[in-house]
């Protein structure tokens, strides 16, 4: 038991040290004092836009500092309880303390990753698109496995999800889907997952038991706040309505409630069929279009648009971000960071935190996603 406790303590202390350096707590505290003085100025609201910017920054820094101090305080309290339990040889309390250290280790590691979030939309909700590659049944099944993986990942992080659009495969799985992920910092946690995913396994659909390779792609873009202006001209839009093709009961296919919107200049397409109301589906599809166009604009600014669009559209060997090998051995490897694990079951069950952390650490050198 003592060895496990020591291991958790070491992990927590290492995370807190990395957080201290990542946030630069001393500089953060100085900046927070400056912001408190600026936001106390009675003339602050003479410039509404500037006031909103300063308040957002102040609230963000206050939250980070409060979380850091609370983690330190929690560690101190548990260490004090552990010392008393050790003196009294209270095994029951020590068992509970071990679980407390485990929980604190998980929370601290999560906050350590969130300290790497630096984009202006990292705190927002986001949309996740999954598209099966060529290969019919195999890729459709792989796309559905990916959908489950990301739904479980969102659940692990405490996010809510809503399937906006889904097209089923002819035999199994899905051809494509769009999922709205709802929760604070959802985009920050998902943004590095855009790209092509390759699966190697013994096919359950091949009578000869051959090893097969399948591809599917994911693309993540942030939901846009009202204070971010995205101009879309009506003349640039083509709006089509159609009957829903997904599951949902007898009412789904009785009216043309599903909506597809095409932004003609960029050939960007969104569609929604999650509601029986055409009006609500149109509003959701328009919100998704705004988010996609914002993402494309950010990519252009970062001079990554060609690479990102390739990742989004070309489900092939040359644009992979991750490989999932289930036979003849088991390994999941990220081809950008070289991070890998043999826990394929855990990964496919949504355990993606370490992959995200590795990608964010690499991107933190200055690349934005």
UniProtKB/Swiss-Prot annotation:
Its main location: cytoplasm. Pfam families: PCRF (PF03462), RF-1 (PF00472). Belongs to the prokaryotic/mitochondrial release factor family. One of its GO terms (cellular component) is cytoplasm. It comes from Rickettsia prowazekii (strain Madrid E). Keywords: Cytoplasm, Methylation, Protein biosynthesis. NCBIfam families: prfB (TIGR00020). HAMAP family: Rel_fac_2. Peptide chain release factor 2 directs the termination of translation in response to the peptide chain termination codons UGA and UAA. It is found in: Cytoplasm. This is Peptide chain release factor 2. GO terms for molecular function: translation release factor activity, codon specific.
């Amino acid at each position: 038991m003592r060895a496990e406790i020591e291991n958790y303590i070491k992990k927590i202390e290492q995370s807190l040290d990395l957080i201290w350096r990542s946030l630069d707590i001393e500089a953060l505290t100085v900046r927070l004092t400056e912001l408190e003085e600026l936001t106390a100025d009675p003339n602050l609201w003479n410039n509404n836009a500037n006031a909103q910017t300063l308040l957002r920054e102040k609230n963000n820094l206050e939250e980070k500092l409060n979380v850091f101090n609370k983690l330190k305080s929690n560690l101190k309290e548990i260490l004090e309880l552990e010392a008393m339990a050790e003196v009294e040889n209270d095994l029951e309390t020590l068992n509970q303390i071990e679980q407390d250290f485990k929980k604190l280790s998980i929370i601290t590691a999560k906050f350590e990753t969130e300290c790497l979030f630096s984009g202006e939309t990292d705190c927002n909700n986001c949309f996740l698109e999954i598209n099966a590659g060529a290969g019919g049944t195999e890729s459709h099944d792989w796309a559905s496995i990916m959908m489950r993986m990301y739904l479980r990942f969102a659940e692990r992080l405490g996010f809510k999800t809503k399937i906006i659009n889904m097209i089923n495969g002819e035999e199994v799985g899905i051809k494509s889907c769009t999922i709205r992920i709802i929760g604070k910092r959802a985009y920050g946690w998902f943004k590095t997952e855009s790209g092509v995913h390759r699966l190697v396994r013994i096919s359950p659909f091949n009578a000869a038991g051959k090893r097969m390779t399948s591809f599917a792609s994911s693309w993540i873009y942030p939901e846009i706040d009202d204070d971010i202006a995205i101009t879309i001209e009506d003349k640039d839009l083509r709006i089509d309505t159609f009957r829903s093709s997904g599951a949902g009961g007898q009412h789904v296919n009785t009216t043309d409630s599903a909506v597809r919107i095409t932004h003609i200049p960029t050939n960007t397409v969104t569609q929604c069929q999650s509601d029986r109301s055409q009006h609500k589906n149109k509003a959701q599809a328009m919100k998704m279009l705004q988010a996609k166009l914002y993402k494309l604009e950010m990519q252009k600014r970062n001079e990554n648009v060609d690479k990102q669009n390739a990742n989004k559209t070309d489900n092939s060997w040359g644009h992979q971000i991750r490989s999932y090998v289930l036979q003849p051995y088991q390994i999941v490897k990220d081809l950008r960071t070289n991070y890998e694990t043999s826990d394929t079951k855990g990964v496919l069950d949504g355990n993606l935190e370490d992959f995200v952390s590795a990608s964010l650490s690499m991107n933190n050198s200055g690349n934005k996603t």
